[in-house]
């Protein structure tokens, strides 16, 4: 047991100076699974790491292992279906499909314009992802109309929208 405490550290501790950042894409099925856990994650984060920073990209990175975009899409949809079943995430098991382009634009507008912050924003983010991935386009359209009529874009450091290539959701410290 004394060896454990005296052994050399193999990796430097991660710095938390910049907090915790998650990169998402609205049309990425792994992002859909990840946002279902963000509320719980935020509750257990220490105050030193908060607020959780969220970066939403509209650009997909190149698929891995020389896969085509179609092969990657099919693979990720099947993989996410298995993960969702194993971990009890919400997921369309009948016929999972990517959200349509109009719905993606509406979802981004809703998220850009909402004044909600912290945990309330995370709840909205999860709801918007559910609407996208469960093809609840009527609900999404209603929120979109409200957002465009009553809100303006919010510029918050913990919420950013950009075009950096993201293949699948990931965290960065």
Where are these regions (language model features)?
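Short, contiguous strand/loop micro-motifs
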Residues: 25-26, 67-68, 160-162
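Structural alpha/beta surface segment adjacent to cysteine/selenocysteine redox centers
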Residues: 33-133
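C-terminal cap of thioredoxin/glutaredoxin-like
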Residues: 1-8, 19-20, 31-43, 116-173
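Generic signal for short, ordered secondary-structure residues
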Residues: 7, 17-21, 59-63
